[in-house]
Amino acid sequence: MAKKIMVIDDDPIIVKYLVTLFSDNGYETCSASDGVQALEAVKTARPDLITLDLEMPQEWGPRFYRKLSKDAELKKIPVIVISGLAGQHAVKDAVAFIRKPFDLDKLLGIVKKTIG
């Protein structure tokens, strides 16, 4: 069974780009466009990994991450932060912080190292 990656980003172009990248490399994908929608989607989809943008409408990335971290099961899901902001300290337990614009090979390497 393919590993599932959830892409959380408010930019539909980035979402499409990452969903295509991950799908083309054998991963199942799902997405959410803001932190409020994402929390419910994570509970339902139970992804193996999350990519998270920091700056989103309604609820920004670090706040979503704090809520995720309060759930005993959900906090086990590895998170890769992909953001144009220089706020890697805002999600200190993330597997990696990748600054936009990002290198696809680097991102894919981190994903493969993290979930196979």
Stretch-by-stretch model annotation:
Residues 8-9, 32, 50:
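Conserved sequence signature across two-component system core domains
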Residues 102-115:
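C-terminal output helix
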Residues 34-37, 60-64:
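Acidic catalytic/metal-coordinating carboxylates
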Residues 56:
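Receiver (REC) domain active-site loop signature in two-component systems and cognate sites
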Residues 45-51:
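Active-site beta3 strand of CheY-like receiver
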